[in-house]
Amino acid sequence: MTATRHFLLAAGGTGGHMLPAYALADELIARGHRVALVSDDRGLKIPGAPAELETHVLPAGRASGGPLGWLKGALAIRKGRRMAIELIDDFDPAVVVGFGGYPSLPSLLAAGATKRPRVIHEQNAVLGRVNRLMAPRVDAVAVAYHHIQRYPAGHELKMHITGNPVRDEIVAIREEGFPPLLEDGIFRLLVVGGSLGATVLSEVVPAAIAMLPRALLDRLQVVQQCREDDLEAVRARYAELGVAAECAPYIKDFPERLRWAHMVIARAGASTVAELACAGRPAIFVPYPHAMDDHQTYNVVDLVEAGGAISFRQSDFIPAEVAKHIQRMAVEPGVLEEAAERAASCGLPDATRDLADLVESFAAPPMMDVIRVGASLPRAASGIAAARREAK
């Protein structure tokens, strides 16, 4: 039986940071460990946290906005670091794991001050600011892609490709396989645009569908996430076209909708890309053009090169090109199925387990474990001394 250890996770206040942290927490708790998570107020409002997860809010100012903003941010980070040291002294984690974002920084700095092993996980194909700062200082860097931009030179040996943790419901879709499509059968299209939808998708996708032949419109079913402001106009356009469509500002049952879909049109956030690849769903990606360091464009490189997706810069995302791609996939089942296989080849369904294995590997064994594995008293005493040295 695995001995219980304590792990402290720290993540920024967005779903992109929090959901992988929740997934790792779930896995570590299932392995019998005790897990705590540090974030900000915004992060801890994101649903999906395991019931057994302990949560803490620490100050973590953002160092930006001119000299005064930098000073306020630095003072908040310093205060957060001091409070994180107190938390670490009390919780006694074997390892501290950061998931990026400014709220992860105080805990990682405190872990360094208290000589705790540190692991960071980067969800995107471009290392974020906090992870870029911490990569030279931590023990391991878990990444989701083979090619990582802005990774500090000289620290490549710390890099471990684990992938982005995905939900068990998504892994189950992969195991079920791709839904068959007959040449004259229903073609199911899922359109998602980040947490609250994207206006560009609400404008371009219905216009593209309007260009399809009548025979294909009769076979088409659409589920589309829309911004509240766009909702009625998109519904009206599909009704005018006679297309069976369901539109909503938020897709609550996303795994079930993904299982249903033959193809997806989406933004290119790290979680979305990971889930589509794991499920094996062909996609048209429209990376958000204002993402930090253009990381969404880099997130889809592997999938596009494998043939499981195509990607448009937002300025090139025009109805005629989108219609052409939808039509080809809908009328050529062989092409669609091959794209699905190529997408699945980029999926990493064991990402959560692999990340948990990596994190556990840096946890010093508890004293009783060392005693149990010792063949003799001298060996046990030697093991205890080594474990204490590692834990310092």
Curated annotation (Swiss-Prot):
UDP-N-acetyl-alpha-D-glucosamine binds at residues 14-16, 124, 167, 195, 251, 296. Belongs to the glycosyltransferase 28 family. MurG subfamily. One of its GO terms (cellular component) is plasma membrane. Keywords: Cell cycle, Cell division, Cell inner membrane, Cell membrane, Cell shape, Cell wall biogenesis/degradation, Glycosyltransferase, Membrane, Peptidoglycan synthesis, Transferase. It comes from Sphingopyxis alaskensis (strain DSM 13593 / LMG 18877 / RB2256) (Sphingomonas alaskensis). It is an enzyme of class 2 (transferase). InterPro entries: GlcNAc_MurG (IPR006009), Glyco_trans_28_C (IPR007235), GlycoTrans_28_N (IPR004276). One of its GO terms (biological process) is peptidoglycan biosynthetic process. GO terms for molecular function: UDP-N-acetyl-D-glucosamine:N-acetylmuramoyl-L-alanyl-D-glutamyl-meso-2,6-diaminopimelyl-D-alanyl-D-alanine-diphosphoundecaprenol 4-beta-N-acetylglucosaminlytransferase activity; undecaprenyldiphospho-muramoylpentapeptide beta-N-acetylglucosaminyltransferase activity. Pathway: Cell wall biogenesis; peptidoglycan biosynthesis. Its EC number is 2.4.1.227. NCBIfam families: murG. The keyword DNA repair does not apply. The gene is murG. It catalyses: di-trans,octa-cis-undecaprenyl diphospho-N-acetyl-alpha-D-muramoyl-L-alanyl-D-glutamyl-meso-2,6-diaminopimeloyl-D-alanyl-D-alanine + UDP-N-acetyl-alpha-D-glucosamine = di-trans,octa-cis-undecaprenyl diphospho-[N-acetyl-alpha-D-glucosaminyl-(1->4)]-N-acetyl-alpha-D-muramoyl-L-alanyl-D-glutamyl-meso-2,6-diaminopimeloyl-D-alanyl-D-alanine + UDP + H(+). The keyword Transferase applies. This is UDP-N-acetylglucosamine--N-acetylmuramyl-(pentapeptide) pyrophosphoryl-undecaprenol N-acetylglucosamine transferase. It is a peripheral membrane protein. Cell wall formation. Catalyzes the transfer of a GlcNAc subunit on undecaprenyl-pyrophosphoryl-MurNAc-pentapeptide (lipid intermediate I) to form undecaprenyl-pyrophosphoryl-MurNAc-(pentapeptide)GlcNAc (lipid intermediate II). It is found in: Cell inner membrane.
